[in-house]
C-alpha cells in the first residue's frame, strides 16, 4: 500500500525498559542498527500493524508491552535514490510512519528475533534513549529525532 505521493505507510517501534533505555536492533548479517519498524497492510490500523510487527520482528505479544504514546501525525523520510526500486509500480520513494513508544511489561527473555522464517534482526541491546540519533543511517535520522523528541515527555522511568 503506497500513497499517492509515493510513501509507504509504516509503524516505528520504540520499546523501553524500566530504566528508560530503548531496544536497539541489529539488522541481520549487517552492522546496521535501528528501531523495529514495518509496513501497514491494507485494512490494518497502525495499532494492529504495531502488534503484528512487534511479534514478527522481536517476538513480543500485546500482553508483553504497554503503549505509552504515539506520534500525532505521520513522519516521513525519503529513501536514497540507490534504494528506490525504479522498476516497481507503484513507485515507493520513502516511508511515512506513525511511531509508538512502548514499555516492556513482560519478561526481557521473551524478546526473540528468530520466530519467523525470514528474521530482520539477529541481535539487540538496550541503549540510552537518545543514543540512536547518532547511530541510525543518515536518511532516517531526522524522523528518529522528531519521534524521540515528541515522545520523550511520555517516557516512564521507574526507580
From Swiss-Prot:
Q: Which GO terms describe its molecular function?
A: mRNA 5'-diphosphatase activity
- Give, as one word, the top-level EC class: hydrolase
Q: Per the database record, which ranges form the Nudix hydrolase domain? A: 6-149
Query: Recorded E.C. number(s)?
Result: 3.6.1.-
Q: What does this protein do?
A: Accelerates the degradation of transcripts by removing pyrophosphate from the 5'-end of triphosphorylated RNA, leading to a more labile monophosphorylated state that can stimulate subsequent ribonuclease cleavage.
**Family according to the record:** Belongs to the Nudix hydrolase family. RppH subfamily.
Under PANTHER family, the record lists: M7GPPPN-MRNA HYDROLASE
What protein am I looking at?
RNA pyrophosphohydrolase
Organism the protein comes from: Ectopseudomonas mendocina (strain ymp)
Amino acid at each position: 500500500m503506497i500513497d499517492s505521493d509515493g510513501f509507504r505507510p509504516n509503524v516505528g517501534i520504540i520499546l523501553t525498559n524500566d530504566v528508560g533505555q530503548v531496544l536497539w536492533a541489529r539488522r541481520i548479517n549487517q552492522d546496521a542498527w535501528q528501531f523495529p519498524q514495518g509496513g501497514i497492510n491494507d485494512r490494518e490500523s497502525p495499532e494492529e500493524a504495531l502488534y503484528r510487527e512487534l511479534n514478527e520482528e522481536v517476538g513480543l505479544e500485546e500482553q508483553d508491552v504497554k503503549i505509552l504514546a504515539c506520534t500525532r501525525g505521520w513522519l516521513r523520510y525519503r529513501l536514497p535514490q540507490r534504494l528506490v526500486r525504479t522498476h516497481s509500480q507503484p513507485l515507493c520513494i520513502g516511508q511515512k510512519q506513525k511511531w509508538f513508544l512502548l514499555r516492556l511489561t513482560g519478561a526481557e527473555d521473551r524478546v526473540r528475533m528468530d520466530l519467523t522464517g525470514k528474521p530482520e534482526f539477529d541481535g539487540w541491546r538496550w541503549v540510552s534513549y537518545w543514543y540512536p540519533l547518532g547511530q541510525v543511517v543518515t536518511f532516517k535520522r531526522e524522523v528518529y529525532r522528531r519521534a524521540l523528541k515528541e515522545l520523550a515527555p511520555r517516557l516512564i522511568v521507574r526507580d
